[in-house]
């Protein structure tokens, strides 16, 4: 039986607390709407490796992360990756549950050393190919921030839209990858990190880092560090730590009874020439993968995914999803979106959803507040990959994302001979105005008329309409464009432009 641990616990505790702090910021930013949380979310998401690699103008972040990894090891995985911290958190919870049941003392193995599989190198290569050819589904499936973001988006859907059957089903579908990873983490720790495209890529650089975890000659091969390692990268019999898979959790230093596991210089000068060549070869491969993905991606958009041909042939209509303002078109949007769901979290109106399970879009089927706010640019502000291009408030006010269709035969003015005008009152651009309407035997009324030149597809008319079924429908446009702007009051002529007073007239 191993002696009581005499290793320094401070590094492991401090590192874990920092990682928990970063995770707490992520959870707060995803689940708490507001300008502060959106600012934090934009900063955190744009600092993620895959988002920076795939995003425009974020090459500096990629280079900084690679440089830090090349010197210190996988610091990014240690404290900045929220999915890694989630795995480690549940790994610790699993350990407490096993300890409570006494199973650890009866020899139930939790992780232990697992020989690395060379097949894992195929994951970042395939993802890099997807980045180059604008094929994001591969990244969406295996990327850590995408997986974590969809899980948080699922929780937000439950909180913001209630617990209906449809919402619950959607939330479960979005969270399935995260749930599976958490279940595996209970017993196998950070097993996903061995196959994560970001982890594998950074691992190549980490293997060449002069600093890292090392085992001294005083190691007694007791195996305690091997069992406690959430990454399964310690071979206690061989007295070796796999620097590629080590996530710098410092658990080994905290439990080592002889103090043999430590972080420091790994003896670069004493490494054989052959080993150095292996290190440099791995780092070179990683550099080529990252460089090709970042540099060639924008220039090879002509090699778009095959499904783009089908998407381009779709006509305007309800078959197209209504995309967030700044998404340009479906090809651009799906070719850059990594499904981190930061836009879902940032939307103050809670109308950005992901009913297709991957790429978010606008859903106007909710309550009466379900309209894209006229002055809001939050989704374009937090998007890390420019799938939603950044818009100014003035550009947002003129960006057409959909077109309304007015069915006057459904309007309460026509069906119930009641005064209304709610649609014209809430329309922010003046696409809807009121004109005189009369029928024999009914009092003087006004009716809405619609001018699509001013319509931006915000959905305010649909949200405010009291008719059943509603007198408006919305259809996405194939290509977002700028309208002529809002209708000036002096151009209304004989039309009666209803001023927005903040209250519906019924």
Each model region followed by its residue ranges:
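Non-ligating segments of multi-cofactor redox enzymes
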Residues: 1-239, 244-245, 250-506
């Amino acid at each position: 039986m191993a002696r009581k641990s005499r290793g320094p616990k401070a590094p492991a505790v401090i590192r874990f607390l920092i990682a928990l702090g970063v995770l707490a910021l992520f959870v707060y930013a995803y689940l708490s709407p507001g300008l502060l949380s959106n600012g934090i979310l934009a900063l955190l998401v744009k600092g993620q490796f895959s988002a920076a690699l795939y995003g425009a103008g974020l090459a500096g972040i990629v280079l900084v992360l690679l440089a830090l990894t090349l010197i210190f090891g996988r610091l990014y995985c240690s404290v900045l990756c929220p999915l890694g911290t989630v795995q480690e958190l549940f790994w610790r919870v699993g350990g407490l549950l096993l300890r409570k049941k006494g199973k650890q003392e009866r020899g139930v193995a939790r992780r232990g050393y697992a020989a690395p599989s060379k097949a894992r190198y195929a994951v970042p290569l395939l993802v890099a190919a997807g980045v180059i050819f604008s094929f994001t589904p591969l990244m969406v499936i295996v990327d850590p921030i995408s997986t974590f973001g969809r899980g948080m988006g699922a929780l937000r859907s439950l909180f913001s839209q209630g617990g209906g059957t449809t919402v619950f089903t959607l939330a479960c579908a979005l969270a399935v990858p995260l749930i599976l990873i958490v279940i595996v983490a209970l017993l196998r720790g950070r097993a996903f990190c061995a196959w994560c495209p970001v982890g594998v890529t950074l691992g190549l650089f980490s293997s060449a880092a002069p600093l890292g975890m090392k085992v001294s000659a005083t190691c007694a091969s007791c195996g305690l560090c091997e069992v406690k390692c959430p990454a399964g990268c310690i071979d206690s019999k061989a007295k070796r730590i796999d620097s590629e898979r080590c996530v710098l959790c410092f658990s080994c230093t905290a439990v080592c009874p002889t103090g043999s596991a430590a972080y420091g210089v790994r003896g670069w000068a004493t490494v054989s020439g052959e080993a150095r060549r292996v290190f440099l070869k791995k780092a070179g491969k990683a550099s080529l993968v990252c460089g090709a993905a970042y540099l060639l991606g924008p220039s090879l958009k002509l090699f778009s995914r095959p499904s783009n041909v089908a998407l381009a042939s779709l006509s305007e209509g309800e078959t197209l999803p209504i995309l967030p303002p700044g998404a340009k078109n479906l090809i651009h949007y799906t070719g850059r979106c990594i499904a981190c769901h930061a836009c879902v979290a940032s939307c103050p109106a809670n109308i950005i959803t992901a009913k297709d399970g991957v790429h978010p879009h606008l859903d106007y089927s909710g309550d009466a507040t379900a309209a894209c706010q006229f002055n809001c640019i939050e989704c374009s502000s937090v998007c890390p990959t420019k799938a939603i291009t950044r818009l100014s408030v003035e550009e947002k006010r003129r960006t057409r994302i959909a077109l309304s269709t007015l069915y006057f035969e459904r309007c309460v003015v026509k069906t119930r001979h009641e005064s209304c005008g709610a649609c014209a009152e809430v329309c922010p651009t003046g696409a809807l105005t009121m004109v005189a309407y009369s029928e024999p035997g009914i009092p003087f009324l006004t009716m809405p008329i619609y001018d699509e030149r001013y319509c931006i597809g915000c959905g305010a008319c649909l949200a405010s309409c009291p008719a059943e079924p509603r007198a408006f429908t919305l259809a996405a446009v194939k290509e977002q464009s700028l309208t002529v702007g809002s209708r000036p009051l002096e151009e209304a002529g004989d039309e009666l432009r209803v001023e927005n007073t903040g209250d519906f007239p019924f």
